[in-house]
From Swiss-Prot:
It is found in: Gas vesicle. This is Gas vesicle protein J. GO terms for cellular component: gas vesicle; vesicle membrane. It comes from Dolichospermum flosaquae (Anabaena flos-aquae). It holds the Pfam family Gas_vesicle.
């Protein structure tokens, strides 16, 4: 009998070729169609669960995954160069923002430091001006009778009513600046000439009255004065004698 060895070899080669093509086709189909592996793995001892693992595995080609809407590797900075650029730009923007905030804080702090001395200077100026100009003191004074300097004779009486809205007096070099005051004079006797003898009744409003005092006199202070009887200076030929009565 003749051996049949060559026939067996040819059949083997045919079988291997068909098996190789079958595996390639299977892998291509799997990648083209896609395959999902899902399962749970749990390890427990004596009804006590120690480890629990859930597996969700997808095996497919890149094109098939994109068709299914899976493209997470494009946003992964370790797998995509575009994502790495975005991460670098984000870091640069954060550094710029921090530098701008630091500059803004420095500018605001410097502006606050500059405003503080200005407020202090204004307060010093106000203090100096207040020290130069004394504050007015409202003190009511009631004068019932006052006799002025006269040379002699009986002076004529002049009944007047005055409201002095502004009273300023100039003092010596040691005294302070003049201060406005309000004086109400109910009865006033003015200077008369040698020929005048009859009393005159009048009402006068004096808006600005200035009087000079001697160097040794103190500074005037704003006050409210009510004079009921006042006798002024008369001429040399007319003598006068009036008893003064002052109530302060």
């Amino acid at each position: 009998m003749l051996p049949t060895r060559p026939q067996t070899n040819s059949s083997r080669t045919i079988n291997t070729s068909t098996q190789g093509s079958t595996l390639a086709d299977i892998l291509e189909r799997v990648l083209d169609k896609g395959i999902v592996i899902a399962g749970d793995i749990s390890i427990s001892i004596a009804s006590t669960e120690l480890v629990h693992i859930r597996i969700r595995l997808l095996i497919s080609s890149v094109d098939k995954a994109k068709e299914m809407g899976i493209n997470w590797w494009e946003s992964d900075p370790y797998l995509s160069t575009k994502a790495q650029r975005l991460v670098e730009e984000n870091q640069q923007l954060q550094h710029r923002l921090e530098s701008l905030e630091a500059k803004l804080n420095s500018l605001t702090s410097s502006s606050v430091k500059e405003e503080i001395p200005l407020a202090a200077d204004v307060k010093d100026d106000l203090y100096q001006t207040s020290a130069k100009i004394p504050s007015p003191v409202d003190t009511p004074i009631e004068v019932l009778d006052f006799q002025a300097q006269s040379s002699g004779g009986t002076p004529p009486y002049v009944n007047t009513s005055m409201e002095i809205l502004d009273f300023q007096a100039q003092t010596s070099a040691e005294s302070s600046s003049p201060v406005g005051s309000t004086v109400e004079i109910l009865d006033f006797q003015a200077q008369t000439s040698e020929e005048s003898s009859s009393p005159v009744v009048s009402t006068v409003e004096i808006l600005d009255f200035q009087a000079q005092t001697s160097e040794e006199s103190s500074s005037p202070v704003g006050s409210t004065v009510e004079i009921l009887d006042f006798q002024a200076q008369t001429s040399e030929e007319i003598p006068s004698s009036v008893d003064p009565a002052i109530d302060v």
